[in-house]
UniProtKB/Swiss-Prot annotation:
Induction: Expression is induced during host plant infection. Belongs to the RxLR effector family. The keyword Secreted applies. The RxLR-dEER motif acts to carry the protein into the host cell cytoplasm through binding to cell surface phosphatidylinositol-3-phosphate. The RGD RLK-binding motif is required for binding to host legume-type lectin receptor kinases and disruption of the attachments between the host plasma membrane and cell wall. This is RxLR effector protein Avrblb1. Secreted effector that acts as an elicitor of hypersensitive response (HR) specifically on plants carrying defense protein RGA2/Rpi-blb1. Enhances P.infestans colonization of plant hosts Nicotiana benthamiana and potato Solanum bulbocastanum leaves. Associates with host legume-type lectin receptor kinases and disrupts attachments between the host plasma membrane and cell wall. A motif (RxLR-dEER) lies at residues 51-72. The gene is Avrblb1. Residues 99-152 are annotated as: W motif.
Length: 152
């Protein structure tokens, strides 16, 4: 019972302490409500300004955030792209003569990921010499590597 009373009192205090609240006496408050502006608690929390989650625009020292230099969290779209790249790798191993635009796009992403992980055509060939369909994959990776990175 005591917690219910405290909850009701807390809600009452919060409602009455709202900034810019006008009293319920309309006869005397009409002039006040029509001539005065709403006062905010602080100029930092002004409702007229744009809100930003990346920085404080009230501070003149703050520069525009550079969103390209930060690493994004692991998301569903990233994981879906990763699964598509892996599936494309399997598809390329089984049917190496596919040349559609989506296949070439995922091939480029797959080869870029391989290059960023430090793989070269020689290192891949030495790791996977025993696979029968590996030669087509390595030839395509070598062509991509020579075109984008330089001769190996």
């Amino acid at each position: 019972m005591r917690s219910l009373l405290l909850t009701v009192l807390l809600n009452l205090v919060v409602l009455l302490a709202t900034t810019g609240a006008v009293s319920s006496n309309l006869n005397t408050a009409v002039n006040y409500a029509s001539t005065s502006k709403i006062r905010f608690l602080s100029t930092e929390y002004n409702a007229d300004e744009k809100r930003s989650l990346r920085g404080d625009y009230n501070n003149e020292v703050t520069k525009e955030p550079n969103t390209s230099d930060e690493e994004r969290a692991f998301s569903i779209s990233k994981s879906a792209e990763y699964v598509k790249m892996v599936l494309y790798g399997f598809k390329l191993g089984f049917s190496p003569r596919t040349q559609s635009k989506t296949v070439l796009r995922y091939e480029d992403k797959l080869f870029t990921a391989l290059y960023k992980s430090g793989e070269t055509p020689r290192s891949l060939r030495t790791k996977h010499l025993d696979k029968a369909s590996a030669s087509v994959f390595f030839n395509r990776f070598k062509k991509w590597y020579d075109k984008n990175v330089g001769p190996s």
